Amino acid sequence: MPRRILVTSALPYANGPIHLGHLVEYIQTDIWVRFQRMRGHECYYVCADDAHGTPIMLRAQQEGVTPETLIDQCSQEHQADFADFAISFDSYHSTHSAENRTLSETIYLRNRDKGHITTRIVRQAYDPVKGMFLPDRFIRGTCPRCDALDQYGDNCEVCGATYSPTELKEAISVLSGTPPIERESEHYFFKLNDFEPLLKRWTQGGHLQPEMANKLNEWFEAGLQDWDISRDAPYFGFPIPESTDKYFYVWLDAPIGYLASFKHLCDREGLDFDSFMTPHSTAELYHFIGKDILYFHALFWPAMLHGAGFRLPTAIFAHGFLTVNGQKMSKSRGTFIKARTYLKHLNPEYLRYYFAAKLGSGIEDLDLNFDDFMSRVNADLVGKVINIASRCAGFINKHFQNRLADRLVEKSLFQKFVAASEHLAQHYEAREFGHAMREIMALADQANRYIDEQQPWVAIKDPERKQEVQEVCTLGLNLFRQLMIYLKPVLPMTTEKAEAFFNSQSLTWSDVDTPLLNHTINRFEPLMIRAEKIKIEAMIEDSKEHLQQNTNAVKPTALLAEHPIAETIQFESFAKLDLRIARILKAEQVEGADKLLRLELDLDGETRQVFAGIKAAYAPESLVGRLTVMVANLAPRKMRFGISEGMVLAAGPGGKEIYLLNPDEGARPGMRVK
């Protein structure tokens, strides 16, 4: 019986371009959605631009345009990128829409009327020069725990500590460069703890991946806190009903944007919105997200929906981050690659296939290794799958007037491909795309072996074996057709070319057991060319050039204006720091820590354990064996996860933009930096 399914991907922020890291999620989701449609299910895929918040307001001011103009331009760029990567949204909307405003107000008011909203006075950092309250990320200063310089207003990327902006030492506003002052303001809070019993049942009820459900247990143990859902003017967003100069925090109306985009689709296509969103709906609702935004989607979002009388998600599927060549995406190395830069040089279906080949149902990070990328594309897609058609089509085109034989010469092989259908469908359904790709390539190997054994290029020289050649090539092309059916969720554009070659209608999953016989095909045209190293290298260089252009456009004093040089110290003060070269012997994730990696450092005979807030920037395995610089005489600090016996040095604003110091060749562990 056909299922009714609504699927969403996380909303990209309308303040910058789509890059390859974003595309992991959209490609993963699109493959799953296309598979559901091929199976005959009623499946809708919606998304939108996340178009509210302080960063958008400030960027619009800097560019001298309205926020609406900025987000419209960004939306056009995003949609063009998605279309060229064959992401098949049924609706791509914006959180700055009439539908989203209505739904946000409805959800807020229903929760308020049930007593789930409260207000209280909070003390916040305020920029007197800019005349606005400052989000935590717009405040920088010295960590109150470890004294690391240039840290955000809410957490330290070095030691992992969290704190309030008022605790930050020597704090400054990144907007004006002046110290913020404290000012009181009334804020609105969502009482998340009201929903704790519901959320415990739901998060442990099979709606999340096991590792994600386990992670949520830590938050339950710590106690669910009220969630601040308001921001003060000036702010780009929706005003809170019956309030003055108060706006919904972007994270309140962003997930509601899923429903707004679907409502936009329903109004356009005459669909019944309520039949998908009422508590007892039989429709299915799935959210694909990055593992870093689980807290909002698995706690706040279900609670808000339940409080407003809507149904809860059927499941939330989280995925890991993208690394490139074993390291975080880097602008300096040219591996921070925008979607548009990729499209300028390479076939988008190369990336769709590579991601599919490496994606599973878990939350492990995915590494894009360009040597492996080129090898897999050329060996699997061109060398195996497409090769079957190119080996057989020429004989049919040239010797048989484009006509396929009227029978299958070896039905058992065809049926073997048919028999793989349900197992492959199970892999697709479970998001185990990597398993599916391996099994499909194993089938392609069998098809190529069959052609090798039959040698139609030899048989065609014997006039008495002409019919044999037609039958062998007919079977080969039917096996190729079956493979294209199985690969259609991953390679929709190549499959469309194959459908034109076969002179057939759009292929569905059920077509796999029906051979194409006594049928006229079209002349074969190359369906895909090999990936070339020179084009990959050109893409990387082009990404570096974009960085250079952007760098030249920024005033040379921009960083210093944002982060002024600290007060002058005497040499004696600097000499108190014992900086040493250290080699990273081990690097591993810390269970229960969102930002920390545990490093084991060699100081030439002495080993130190250091916890570093670099998890978002580096895959642990990419750090092993590298040299770095550490503060060796920093007093040991007891943390929840163990004793940290020093500090490694890094530059950058934090998060994924962290750059470990890397000594030049010749430096050895234990050497002092002076």
From Swiss-Prot:
SUPFAM superfamilies: Anticodon-binding domain of a subclass of class I aminoacyl-tRNA synthetases, Methionyl-tRNA synthetase (MetRS), Zn-domain, Nucleic acid-binding proteins, Nucleotidylyl transferase. Residues 573-674 form the tRNA-binding domain. ATP binds at residue 331. The keyword Nucleotidyltransferase does not apply. It comes from the Bacteria. Pfam families: Anticodon_3 (PF19303), tRNA-synt_1g (PF09334), tRNA_bind (PF01588). A motif ('KMSKS' region) lies at residues 328-332. Coiled coil: none annotated. Zn(2+) binds at residues 143, 146, 156, 159. A motif ('HIGH' region) lies at residues 12-22. One of its GO terms (biological process) is methionyl-tRNA aminoacylation. Its cofactor is Zn(2+). GO terms for molecular function: ATP binding; metal ion binding; methionine-tRNA ligase activity; tRNA binding. Binds 1 zinc ion per subunit. GO terms for cellular component: cytosol. Keywords: Aminoacyl-tRNA synthetase, ATP-binding, Cytoplasm, Ligase, Metal-binding, Nucleotide-binding, Protein biosynthesis, RNA-binding, tRNA-binding, Zinc. Is required not only for elongation of protein synthesis but also for the initiation of all mRNA translation through initiator tRNA(fMet) aminoacylation. HAMAP family: Met_tRNA_synth_type1. Homodimer. This is Methionine--tRNA ligase. It comes from Nitrosococcus oceani (strain ATCC 19707 / BCRC 17464 / JCM 30415 / NCIMB 11848 / C-107). The gene is metG.
